[in-house]
Design a protein with these regions (language model features):
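C-terminal structural segments of small proteins and small subunits
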Residues: 46-74
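Intrinsically disordered, low-complexity, charged/polar segments
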Residues: 5, 16, 71-73
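Short alpha-helix capping/helix-loop boundary micro-motifs
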Residues: 24-28
């Protein structure tokens, strides 16, 4: 299983699932546009690897690497 935090800058992927028991975090990720079958691209990582900047649906989104670990991609 590959997760969003495993992408390298410039790589693209498609979201296949969101894991985790925390429903408020899951809802927040969905509200930010991180839904199933959405194409995402890792733009860059912060100097120490956290957070990461994504391009989702034509806009930039920055999330924590710990949150990215919950998002399955292919």
């Amino acid at each position: 299983m590959k997760t969003l935090d495993m992408l390298k800058p410039g790589e693209n992927a498609v979201i296949t699932g969101i894991n985790g028991q925390n429903t408020s975090l899951r809802r927040r990720l969905l509200d930010m546009g991180l839904t199933l079958n959405t194409k995402v691209s890792l733009v860059r990582e912060a100097p120490f690897g956290d957070p990461i900047e994504l391009e989702v649906r034509g806009y930039s989104l920055t999330i924590r690497k710990s949150d990215a670990q919950l998002i399955e991609v292919k």
